[in-house]
Amino acid sequence: TAGTNNYTRAQAAAQVRGAYDYHAQTLGWCDIGYNVLVDKFGTIYEGRYGGLDKAVQGAHVGGFNSNNWGISMIGNYETAEPSREMLNSVAEIAGWKAAISGIDPMGKASLYSGGFNGSKFPAGTTATVPSFAGHNDFHYTACPGQYTTRHWDEIRKNTKRKADAIKSGKNSTDLNWQESPQPNTPKTPQQVGEEITSSLGDVEVPVSTISALAGIAAAVF
């Protein structure tokens, strides 16, 4: 999600609450648009209320909000490199969702366009995209950012490794995560954020269809 990259670990949850406040309070939407948010420390947050294991419709890529799942990477990755912890957690949660949904993360998906301003696909047409896709696969936008998209192949491979591990009964700690080369950037220890928290507490908020907000990475499930 386009925004600051300078938040601390203690401030990370407030970034999620800020996204909710903007979506639900400022814009008048019923809930946060993303199904999941991941911070730069690798923490995974539940976004749209309803259960991560359920087919909850989000609102993250206008015209294609049905039959997919939206992951927000908190920060601006057009201007900064996503952390290793963030990349690993995106693959963790996407792989888990792919496994329980019967989706091949390395495959393709055909989605019907409902039409949206800035969409690459007119209303009524079909978009055939990777099963794990980005906002810019659907809309004319820089999102999810140049420093995210250069990791796309890596994330897809690690997502599939996670999905395959779940199907075979392995733990995520058994995985040997693959990294994309990062020129002039020192490598950090590979860590996976395993904490999953709800951004909405016990408040029940009904589902609605709302427009997309720039700055997401959308895992299409």
Predicted regions located by residue number:
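Cell wall/extracellular polymer interaction/catalysis modules
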Residues: T1-L27
